[in-house]
A protein has these predicted regions:
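Flexible, solvent-exposed coil segments and beta strand-coil junctions
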Residues: 110-120, 189-200, 243-263, 302-312, ...
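Short glycine/proline- and aromatic-enriched beta-strand/turn motifs that initiate or cap beta-hairpins
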Residues: 27-131, 136-140, 246-248, 303-310
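Residues that define the transmembrane beta-barrel architecture of outer-membrane proteins
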Residues: 129-135, 207-212, 231, 259-267, ...
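Short loop/turn motifs that connect adjacent beta-strands in outer-membrane beta-barrel proteins
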Residues: 28-29, 43-54, 140-146, 162, ...
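Outer-membrane beta-barrel pore domains and translocons
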Residues: 61-63, 154-158, 219, 238-242, ...
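Long, hydrophobic, well-ordered secondary-structure blocks that form the structural core
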Residues: 150-270
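Outer membrane beta-barrel transmembrane domains
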Residues: 55, 67-92, 149, 162-191, ...
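Residues on the lipid-exposed face of transmembrane beta-strands in outer-membrane beta-barrel proteins
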Residues: 135-141, 151, 214-220, 237, ...
Length: 432
């Protein structure tokens, strides 16, 4: 009986890692510049060996931040200036459709004509506070011969508050200085200028679903080896459907709740190695490729413009950069009854997005693609998790609960966000 109990624990442990890794990497709407990847939905009750096992997992967590990692040596900056200060001196340069009778356009033309100096004249900075609360839902169904399928959907509540503008022009700047009539006229008309171009640089508060993931995977395991307890491998491919709310191009700081309307295909592979009946090491990696799409977006009209504020908009083909990720973990499995501890690391990044404007007479492709906001991002994350599973031998229903922390520790062009929360899930084993 004691030997059988050890065998059951061994089986449940290595099957938990198959699904653990599958749910971690295959919840494809999980890699964004504004928060670390969730790593709490999958670590819980060990996976049982029955081929028709059904699982439902929920993870919920949140955090807030006023800081971001900019583009130099993991340095921190204010949240909304992660691409550097905004060059408002040339914000109206080459913008099509200006009205020579409009006071807003006159202010833009006069500002661009003024010869600035290399002392941040005409530059501003934006600050704000970003809050996120997210729920991840994942349904997993085991089939036969190691095959399984998954359906994942996130629900996100995001808000941006305390948005403020700071003039970076130093008082000691030589002519033209902070008191320049042209600059002060621009600042006085700034809100009207944004409104004139259908823009709003303010707060937002929204709740919506993210992008739906449908995944098919295959797992295999090797056990009863001389040195190792087991080795688990799995391979997955899935589709990412654009069910999330798209970015509002008329809101300067708006963030889409998914991948902004782009269809995606994800592939990944994982490995887990168990030793000593209580220690597990593993690694994983994958990539998400997106289909291009033609839509209305904001674009730069001068290579010297910088930041989120772009007055001109037009149709362009948007080709998002590939997202790829890799990581590893170590797990102390069932060190006290059903209690386990886990620590891990993930590196994820998105490559540069490419734009192809439809009207190349109004939008120079070189200028539109010389945009830091299209340049991609990368993120380093530390994961910590503690969980307890309530599995009992002979029971078909096995619940679990856990708590996690996902900590962003470095990167470029990302929010400096820490997400903490909890997860709950259960397995149902069927007998046929």
């Amino acid at each position: 009986m004691k030997k059988d109990s050890r065998m059951i624990q061994k089986y449940t442990t290595h099957f938990s890692l198959i699904i653990l890794l599958a749910t971690t990497a295959s919840a494809m709407d999980n890699f964004h510049f504004y928060r670390p990847p969730f790593w709490g939905i999958s670590f819980g009750e060990p996976r049982l060996i029955e081929p028709h096992l059904t699982s439902l997992d929920l993870a919920f967590g949140g955090g807030s931040t006023k800081k971001a990692y900019g583009g130099c040596c993991h340095s921190t900056t204010s949240l909304l200036s992660l691409y550097g200060p905004y060059n408002m001196h040339l914000v109206g340069s080459n913008v099509p459709g200006k009205d020579p009778r409009s006071q807003e356009d006159i202010a833009l033309v006069e500002l661009a004509r003024t010869a600035g100096r290399d002392c941040f004249w005409g530059y501003i900075e934006y600050c704000g506070k970003f809050k996120l609360f997210e729920t991840q839902i994942l349904f997993t169904q085991n089939l036969r011969h190691g095959l399984f399928m998954q359906i994942g959907l996130p629900i996100r509540h995001m808000s941006l508050t305390k948005v403020c503008l700071k003039d970076l022009t130093p008082e000691a700047c030589p002519c033209p200085g902070v008191e320049s009539h042209t600059w002060q006229t621009f600042l006085a008309l700034y809100d009207q200028i944004l409104k004139h171009y259908d823009l709003r640089a303010g707060t937002f508060n929204k709740t919506n679903i993210g992008d739906l993931s449908l995944i098919v995977g295959w797992g295999c395991n090797y056990q009863d080896m001389r040195v190792l307890d087991y080795v688990d491998l799995d391979f997955k491919i899935g589709m990412l459907f654009p069910t999330g709310k798209k970015q509002n191009v008329n809101e300067v700081f708006d963030i889409p709740t998914g991948y902004d309307g782009h269809l995606g295909v994800g592939v990944s592979s994982d490995i887990a190695i168990g030793v000593y009946n209580w220690l597990t090491f593993g690694g994983y990696g994958g990539a998400i490729l997106f289909a291009d799409k033609t839509r209305m977006i904001r674009m730069k009209t001068d290579m010297r413009q910088n930041g989120y504020i772009k007055l001109a908009k037009g149709c362009a083909n948007v080709d998002p950069g590939v997202i790829w990720y890799a990581g590893g973990f170590g797990k102390l499995d069932h060190i006290a009854a059903g209690f386990s501890l886990l620590g891990g690391y993930t590196y994820c990044a998105q490559q540069r997005t490419r734009l192809s404007p439809e009207n190349t007479h109004l939008f120079n492709p070189t200028a539109t693609n010389c945009d830091a906001t299209l340049g991609g991002w990368d993120m380093h994350t530390i994961h910590l998790l503690a969980d307890y599973d309530c599995a009992r031998e002979g029971h078909h229903f096995s619940p679990r609960i856990g708590f996690f922390a996902n900590l962003t520790v470095g990167g470029e062009h990302i929010y400096k966000m820490q997400v903490t929360g909890g997860n709950f899930g259960f397995d149902i084993a069927y007998e046929f």
